[in-house]
Amino acid sequence: MISYLLDTHILLWWRTEFRQLSKAQARVLQELEDQGQPAGLSAISLREFAMMIHRRRISIDTPLDTWLDSIESNPLITILPLTPKIAAESGRLGDDFPRDPADQIIVATARCHGLTLITADEGIRKWNKIKLV
């Protein structure tokens, strides 16, 4: 059973820059890994990765499709699709929520699935209407 949803940058840090994680985030991710317990990842995060690579904000040493496939096939990651329920929830987050559509979908995904979101995003953290690590 999935209990946590990873924000896009958290997955990157988990795999490449572990020191960027807070102590609480690192502890939770290590526990998940030790227990073989998967974390959720919104499908929109795959697009965010593709755009980061396209804009050269991150670099990878394999073709993009192969890299994204490796995320999908990772037993510690469960990709959660965008559903009509999540789309509707993303529109209900309110005017005080950040305008980034990807962040809206990620938070709506966590809310619809009853998951705790692991994020360092300040806008989401300030909103403070969801369980966070």
Where are these regions (language model features)?
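Active-site neighborhoods of divalent-metal-dependent phosphate/nucleic-acid chemistry enzymes
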Residues: 59-65, 74-120
